[in-house]
């Protein structure tokens, strides 16, 4: 059996410690929502500092096992810069490192393989602008064609070109991705996109859907609380989910 005990805690700044706890909470939230793929997929978070290091989950642990102290700090070549018993999944840092390095505001990057997200990613038409959730994402979703398992750094520039400045992406035949300046904001975007995919999967099973006019899409996106700083731009939602995690298991804070 693998030894899940962390290495002796490394000295980190109070700011990094806060970010580690928040990122570990996010992994537990994903586990609670069922947004897991065995030990695969990743949520990464840039660590403040000129080195531009970022935190990633240890490869081999389920999201429900991630804690603040066992998160691995790596550079953009995927090398651990602090001691860890666990390796890093090459497919994780290939996608995430490209986005962290290429988009200044991409402090957080999330990637999922949910059933609904992958189903829409496999659809020729992509995201249908026909429901309450997709209508809040007008002009915010990019598409990137499938090039195979993402272990080749050469895909990075093409991925960045596909994304441009859009905070969400559907990776064709693959899954969903979102990036943002914080965990709560990135989560809000990904949650909207995944929820839109869930509704699309259910509604299209019943026959043709009713598309929402573009002017209404624009209005919905402008009015969405998910992007409104007055309502936390996702912070209030993430705080509520963190409280749910706290009630169930505080071990993520270790």
PLM-predicted stretches and their roles:
Residues 1-254:
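Glycine-rich flexible loops
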């Amino acid at each position: 059996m693998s030894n899940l005990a962390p290495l002796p805690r490394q000295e980190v700044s109070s700011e990094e410690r806060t970010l580690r706890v928040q990122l570990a909470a996010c992994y537990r939230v994903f586990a609670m929502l069922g947004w897991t793929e065995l030990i695969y997929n990743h949520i990464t978070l840039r660590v403040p500092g000129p080195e531009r290091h970022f935190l990633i989950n240890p490869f081999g642990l389920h999201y429900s096992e991630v804690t603040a102290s066992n998160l691995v700090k790596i550079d953009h070549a995927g090398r651990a810069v602090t001691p860890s018993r666990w390796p890093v999944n090459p497919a994780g840092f290939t996608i995430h490192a490209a986005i962290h390095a290429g988009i200044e505001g991409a402090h957080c990057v999330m990637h999922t393989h949910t059933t609904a997200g992958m189903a829409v990613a496999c659809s020729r038409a992509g995201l249908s602008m026909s429901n309450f959730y997709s209508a809040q994402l007008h002009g915010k979703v990019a598409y990137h064609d499938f090039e195979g398992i993402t272990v080749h750094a050469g895909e990075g520039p093409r991925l960045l070109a596909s994304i441009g400045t859009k905070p969400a992406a559907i990776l064709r035949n693959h899954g969903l991705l979102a990036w943002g300046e914080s965990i709560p904001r990135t989560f809000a975007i990904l949650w909207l996109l995944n929820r839109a995919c869930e509704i699309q999967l259910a509604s299209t099973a019943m026959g043709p859907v009713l598309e929402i006019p573009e002017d209404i899409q624009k209005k919905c996106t402008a009015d969405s609380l998910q992007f409104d700083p007055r309502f936390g731009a996702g912070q209030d939602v993430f705080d509520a989910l963190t409280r749910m995690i706290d009630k169930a298991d505080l071990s993520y804070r270790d």
